[in-house]
Regions:
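Bacterial lipoprotein signal-peptidase II cleavage site
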Residues: 25-32
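Extracytoplasmic
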Residues: 50-220
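Substrate-binding cleft of extracellular glycoside hydrolase catalytic domains
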Residues: 275-409, 420
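Aromatic-lined carbohydrate-recognition surfaces of secreted/lumenal glycan-active proteins
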Residues: 377-379, 407-432, 473-482
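Aromatic- and acid-rich polysaccharide-binding/catalytic face
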Residues: 431-454, 502
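Substrate-binding cleft of secreted/luminal carbohydrate-active enzymes
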Residues: 473-556
Length: 556
């Protein structure tokens, strides 16, 4: 599991605004025909006429100048470094040929090698570890002068090249520290070589502006076109709000107060709209409250809304293994088997799936009728941490095939049955085996809860997510506990489309902006970066062009 476990806050503010439901009838949740059409009366709400504009928004490509010498190369043998912990040097060749006098074995995250190097110029360098691991896919943490720099994935059980590309280094003398990212996963380091890096390939950020749903609303198409336009040029700031308070949550208030800037993306969780939570005492207005917050953010503030759903398992399957009902989204807290519900072994379980999706559809229909596009991120973290193969939510616990079937079921139910057309589908399965296919996904997401003060770009996770499909798709840091340094990310190519910091302890401490996970200096750097978009810097998204190339050609 991630280094830090997020806390899901289950509390509805008594002061929250309740949105009245406008002309939306429940569909028959007992229906098993996902291709049929829902019998609903939809609200016909008009909006102001669109006058397309980009304003003075800059969409120039971002090319980072590299001042490193073109032919620079420096190799340091691992055994020449200072060893600590239980790190040991060996000259046995059971891992293949090595250079120098031997290589270093590291087994615990406290085992370290310190190496001294002098960098000739500020610039971008490739860092090649000739290394091996007991388990292919293990990682080596590379730090510089005590600060986390980058994670290098070791892909072989024999000594071979494992390159961390485009690492940003400053001129001067430095101490490079190497240690296993994960405890009890042995890694072996033969040498480390620094060479000048090539420029970032900008072609990877060219993404089609066609959504998976051909009937997507105009507002949704405009937002998605904006996202494709800024991908690789900016990272959009985001923050999850606690206590269903939306923009009035303490996170948003404190960020504005201390940083003078507001996150562009408001993160909301439909957890309390789960029918089993309402059956156990959550407010029946929970979904309406969330809808009101989303509408206010889009319509009145001009911001972007993302939604996840900590889907509480249906009532008969709760309180498993001594866990409370409100823990029902965790796989160990419920007896619900997704596989059995989908294969017909648990017919009642399947009907509950349809009931719950239909309940959430009521919230999404309100937003669709009110022209509010949503970055919709259901069934998040389905594969858990792929390194450990440990799905922690029930929707991933039955394996990849069941997860993909549920994703397609939900996509069909919301899109083709309920005709909800305001959703940009963000897949956050964490494991390529859980990927349902390009036709069901618009954006790829990954959730990262890094160690405290690890402001590295998490490029290994970015590359891992990007490689899920051969189709160029936007890659987003859909949840995070620690903010990454945008200078590092834009230099090494891990240009996450957005970040969305989780609420509570990852943002606040004693009702103030917290430095427990992200340092206060990094908070300030991120929210003042020219590469990070805040709410105040967003263009007019309601009037953003549907086709930017055509708009620019017609408005020279």
């Amino acid at each position: 599991m991630f280094a830090k476990t997020k806390k899901v806050i289950s509390f509805i503010s008594a002061a929250a605004i309740v949105l009245s439901i406008t002309g939306c009838n429940k569909s028959d949740s007992s229906s098993n025909d996902e291709s049929s059409r829902a019998e609903t009366t939809r609200a016909n709400i008009t909006t102001a006429p669109v006058v397309e504009t980009l304003g003075d928004f800059d969409l120039s490509d971002v090319v980072i100048e590299n001042k490193a010498p073109a032919d620079y190369k420096k190799t340091i043998e691992a055994e020449d470094g200072k060893l600590s912990g239980d790190a040991i040097s060996t000259d046995k060749n059971f891992l293949g040929d090595f250079t120098g006098k031997g290589f270093i074995s590291l087994f615990h995250d406290t085992d370290k090698i310190d190496l001294d190097i002098e960098i000739p110029e500020d610039g971008s360098y490739d860092v090649n570890l000739v290394s091996a691991a007991d388990q292919a896919g293990s990682s080596c943490q590379i730090s510089i002068d005590g600060a986390a720099l980058v994670t290098s994935k070791i892909n072989s059980t024999e000594l071979s090249d494992n390159v961390a590309e485009k690492v940003l280094l400053t001129k001067g003398k430095h101490t490079i520290t190497l240690n296993p990212k994960d405890d009890m996963k042995g890694i072996y380091i033969d040498s480390i070589t620094f060479t000048t890096a090539k420029a970032v390939d900008l072609e990877q950020y060219k993404v089609s502006n066609e959504l998976s749903n051909p009937n997507a609303t105009e507002e949704t198409q405009r937002l998605y076109n904006f996202l494709t336009n800024v991908y690789g040029k900016y990272t959009i700031s985001g923050q999850y709000a606690s206590n269903s308070e939306g923009k009035d949550s303490r996170e948003f208030v404190q960020l504005k107060k201390e940083l003078g800037a507001t996150p562009a993306i408001l993160g909301l969780d439909l957890i309390e709209a789960s029918p089993s939570r309402i059956a156990n005492g959550s407010s029946e207005s929970s979904g309406q409250i969330i809808a009101a917050q989303a509408m206010d953010w889009w319509n009145n503030e001009g911001g972007i809304v993302t939604m996840c759903w900590h889907w509480n398992a249906p009532e008969p399957y709760l309180n498993a293994n001594g866990h409370a009902w409100w823990e029902g989204f965790n796989q160990e807290a419920t007896s619900f088997s997704l596989a059995k519900a989908l294969n017909g072994e648990d017919k009642e379980g399947y009907d509950y799936l349809i009931r719950d999706i239909d309940a959430i559809a009521e919230v999404l229909i309100q937003l669709d009728d009110n022209h509010v596009p949503i970055l919709w991120r259901p069934l998040h973290e389905g594969g858990g941490d792929p390194q450990w193969n440990n799905p922690w939510f029930w929707w991933g616990a039955s394996g990849a095939d069941a997860y993909k079937e549920l994703w397609k079921l939900m996509y069909d139910r919301l899109t083709n049955y309920h005709h909800i057309n305001n959703l940009i589908w963000v897949w956050n399965g964490q494991n390529p085996q859980y990927y349902p296919g390009d036709e069901y996904v618009d954006i790829l997401g990954y959730d990262i809860y890094a160690n405290e003060h690890d402001s590295s770009s998490q490029k290994d996770k970015y590359d891992y997510t990007q490689a899920t499909t051969e189709t160029n798709k936007i890659v987003a840091l859909s949840e995070n506990g620690v903010l990454f340094d945008p200078d590092i990310a834009f230099n090494d190519g891990a240009r996450w489309a957005w970040f969305c910091t989780w609420n509570g302890e990852f943002t606040l401490k004693d009702m103030q902006l917290s430095d427990e996970y992200t340092t206060l200096d990094m908070w300030k750097k991120v929210y003042s970066s020219e590469r990070v978009l805040t709410l105040e810097e967003l263009p007019d998204l309601k009037n953003y062009p549907l086709d930017t190339e055509k708009f620019l050609a017609e408005n020279k």
